């Protein structure tokens, strides 16, 4: 099969492109700057989503589009950054859609990234793909609009899969990398009670789920999370036991952080990302036959 990956030079895209090539597939990657072609089955093409420009050759012979494009949420949530976080996701989908309308192609499916940020925080509720509740937060709105935009591909008879991604465990990026960096400095931090539920997934499982969905023609929503979520405290404990043991453990009650977070404009970021508390189910992807490499944190040891 031939894949086109948007956001293919990012954390997930890099890992996914390697997996696809290792499994005998060909990969086209859309990027803002052209890169050297170092593999006969890996090609780069230039696009600019804000200007809606794209190299139309990127879609030649492509069977599946994997959409990972979007500005990182791990930034200060200023008004301009919030606008970029939303628009970068919508513009990427619009640019691909525009190309597919104009140029004849053989694309059968688009697998689009999403996030569990669409689900509201809750202490005990378990969220499945058919849950109708939408988080009334900035990130909840971003994910809702992101998924809504992806559904335009159904108008041109393209099968659509949407993966709601949890906290990605990777040493090379995301929140896990930030926690690991603190740990390597000898600091372990617990925010609030530390009991907030973290629905995580190892990056190797995540990219394998993208491949699994693509080759098995699975439509609709899928939660991209591991079967066994953990508390924030358990996540920190795992980092400490598997990596360098910290010499300083800090605990911050939420009330202590409220004013500083507000002054820094980080209240929304805390509620949506750092203080996230949601238990998300992996039952659907397991019932479809996917076997997790890392079903629980203890398997990471």
Annotate each predicted stretch with a short phrase:
Residues 152-162, 166-198, 239:
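NAD(P)-dependent short-chain dehydrogenase/reductase
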Residues 180-188, 196-230, 237:
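Alpha-helical substrate-binding/gating segment
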Residues 215-266:
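Mid/C-terminal beta-alpha module of Rossmann-like enzyme folds, strongest
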Residues 3-23:
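N-terminal Rossmann NAD(P)H-binding glycine-rich loop of SDR-like oxidoreductase domains
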Residues 94-136:
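Conserved Rossmann-fold NAD(P)-dependent oxidoreductase catalytic core, especially the SDR/UDP-sugar
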Residues 269-301:
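C-terminal amphipathic/interface module of NAD(P)-dependent oxidoreductases
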Residues 43-91:
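NAD(P)H-binding glycine-rich loop region in Rossmannoid oxidoreductase-like domains
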Residues 123-162:
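Catalytic helix-loop patch of NAD(P)-dependent Rossmann-fold dehydrogenases
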